[in-house]
């Protein structure tokens, strides 16, 4: 059981509309270091919401660019030894420059190299850690029961340890699942919506990390920014599923629905 009161946030809550409107006005420069499977998709998702993605991955440039971006995503999904160097350089630079950044510890706990890397990256104080229940449980030091990038645990099961992890690291923890939870250890927000078909399109979950990084660039409260990103994803997923025949049409419709979200009151 959660040790805090859980507040639900769904579209079109006032905070969500305000944050999305501000993002579209500012078009924050978002530094994305992600896995090779989802790079193109993530860029398209960020463009659809109104952000400005930049996939700068050379170790010679990553630190310099991280310092001028509005936000940074580091996703370790297909990490290599060279990628790990880039990620540590970028994370350290963002931390030093006080640039908010998101860690997506894909499949952490399942394999040793990425698990050790994720723990090293925690030294650079991520603003937000986003993952499924198994990944969050593994990062918190327990057996998450994951199978690769997939989770066999419920988001609600991971919430108590997510709250402890938030207090330990100082990061906001975002758990993706049938119901998403966002917590800073003291406050917890739940976001319902979306659709199971979202798990049938490669990169949907990973791109959420980029959306969170984008909202961090315009909303200084990381709990609110992360909840807004999750709520935007949920409503776009719900609307897209209703008009899609399968995963292929869903992918296109999802980009459209993100782009078409209205901020008019």
Curated annotation (Swiss-Prot):
Reactions that this protein is recorded to catalyse: 5-(2-hydroxyethyl)-4-methylthiazole + ATP = 4-methyl-5-(2-phosphooxyethyl)-thiazole + ADP + H(+)
Native organism: Leptospira interrogans serogroup Icterohaemorrhagiae serovar copenhageni (strain Fiocruz L1-130)
Transmembrane segments annotated in the record for this chain: none
EC nos: 2.7.1.50
Enzyme class: transferase
Pathway: Cofactor biosynthesis; thiamine diphosphate biosynthesis; 4-methyl-5-(2-phosphoethyl)-thiazole from 5-(2-hydroxyethyl)-4-methylthiazole: step 1/1
Protein name: Hydroxyethylthiazole kinase
GO molecular function: ATP binding; hydroxyethylthiazole kinase activity; magnesium ion binding
One biological process term in Gene Ontology: thiamine diphosphate biosynthetic process
Range of residues in the leader sequence: none
InterPro entries: Hyethyz_kinase (IPR000417), Ribokinase-like (IPR029056)
Positions of disulphide bridges: none
UniProt cofactor(s): Mg(2+)
Alphabetical list of CDD domains matching this protein: THZ_kinase
Family per similarity comment: Belongs to the Thz kinase family.
Positions with a binding annotation for ATP: 130, 176
Role, per record: Catalyzes the phosphorylation of the hydroxyl group of 4-methyl-5-beta-hydroxyethylthiazole (THZ).
Keywords, ordered alphabetically: ATP-binding, Kinase, Magnesium, Metal-binding, Nucleotide-binding, Thiamine biosynthesis, Transferase
Pfam families hit by this protein: HK
Residues where substrate binds: 55, 203
């Amino acid at each position: 059981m959660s040790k805090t009161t859980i507040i639900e946030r769904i579209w079109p809550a006032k905070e969500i509309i305000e944050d999305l409107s501000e993002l579209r006005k500012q078009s924050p420069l978002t530094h994305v270091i992600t896995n090779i499977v989802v790079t193109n998709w993530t860029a398209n998702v960020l463009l659809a919401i109104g952000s400005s993605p930049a996939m700068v991955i050379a170790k010679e440039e990553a630190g310099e660019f991280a310092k001028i971006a509005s936000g940074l995503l580091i996703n370790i999904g297909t990490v290599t030894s060279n990628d790990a160097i880039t990620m540590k350089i970028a994370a350290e630079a963002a931390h030093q420059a006080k640039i908010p950044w998101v860690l997506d510890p894909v499949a952490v706990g399942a394999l040793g190299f990425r698990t050790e890397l994720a723990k090293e990256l925690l030294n650079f104080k991520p603003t937000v850690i986003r993952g499924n229940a198994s990944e969050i449980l593994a990062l918190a030091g327990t057996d998450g029961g994951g199978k690769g990038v997939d989770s066999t645990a419920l988001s609600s099961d991971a919430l108590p340890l997510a709250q402890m992890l938030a207090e330990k690291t100082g990061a906001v923890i975002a758990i993706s699942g049938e119901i998403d939870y966002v917590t800073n250890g003291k406050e917890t927000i739940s976001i319902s919506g979306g659709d199971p078909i979202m798990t049938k399109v490669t990169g949907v979950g990973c791109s959420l990390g980029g959306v969170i990084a984008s909202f961090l660039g315009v909303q200084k409260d990381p709990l609110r920014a992360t909840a807004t990103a999750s709520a935007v994803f949920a409503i776009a997923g719900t609307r897209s599923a209703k008009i899609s025949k399968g995963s292929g049409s869903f992918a296109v419709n999802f980009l459209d629905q993100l782009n078409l979200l209205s901020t008019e009151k």
